[in-house]
A protein has these predicted regions:
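Short, isolated positions within intrinsically disordered regulatory regions of eukaryotic proteins
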Residues: 10-14, 18, 37-39, 51, ...
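Conserved Class I S-adenosyl-L-methionine-dependent methyltransferase catalytic core
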Residues: 46-68, 73-86
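S-adenosylmethionine/decaboxylated-SAM
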Residues: 69-201
Length: 201
């Protein structure tokens, strides 16, 4: 209660206790839909019209050294090289993400912006409650890539509004934050108006 920027988040968490948690169907139905509509990495690259690019080896080696010393309960890397390829090939400059953890996806995006010598990434990450992991958020991002990066340590409700106030449009939005229906609904409806026909969510 001593952190006013988190009040809206706490109020929304309380409201969700009284909402339908699965308005799109049961968890089993939702999972079945996902399996029925999944695709391969190669197909996704084809749909996006991009080739595969790799993050520079020295960045990867540095990130791995940090990853090995980070707490184990912060999640994995995901397909950060797909994000890297997307930004590099499409020459995106206005990038946004919510959910950072150790920062592998952040690294992929920032390494592409560094190659392009253009653009900015605004990341939003709410510190893990009571886990004392704040100092590890973004730990896999080398200091040399920080010049194109703004990290907002806020809940999505505060952070997204602040981030979007800095962009006239958004080229890429990488969403790896609140996985609930209502969390996604809030973020999607806030960000979509800032996206254009060539944007990727």
């Amino acid at each position: 209660m001593q952190r006013p920027s988190f009040w809206a988040y706490m109020v929304e968490e309380l409201r969700r206790k009284f909402k339908d948690r699965t308005p799109l169907g049961s968890p089993v139905e939702i999972k079945d839909w996902c399996y029925a509509n999944e695709s391969t990495r190669e197909n996704v690259f084809g749909w996006l019209g991009i080739g595969s690019r790799s993050v520079e080896k020295n960045f990867i080696e540095w990130a791995l050294s940090r990853n090995d010393t980070a707490p184990p309960n912060m999640g994995g890397a995901g397909d950060f090289e797909m994000l890297h390829s997307l930004v590099a090939e499409k020459k995106y400059s206005q990038c946004l993400e919510s959910g950072v953890s150790k920062g592998w996806s952040t690294l992929g995006i920032l390494a592409a912006l560094d190659q392009l010598n253009n653009g900015r990434l605004i990341s939003i990450d709410m510190p893990y409650p009571k886990l004392h992991l704040e100092d590890w958020v973004g730990c896999c991002v080398p200091a040399g890539l920080h010049k194109r990066w703004d990290l907002l340590r806020l809940p999505d409700r505060n952070g997204l509004k602040r981030a979007l106030s800095n962009y006239c449009s958004v080229d890429l939005y990488h969403y790896d934050s609140d996985k609930t229906y209502w969390g996604r609904w809030y973020a999607f409806n806030l960000v979509f108006p800032k996206m254009h026909k060539n944007s990727v969510f």
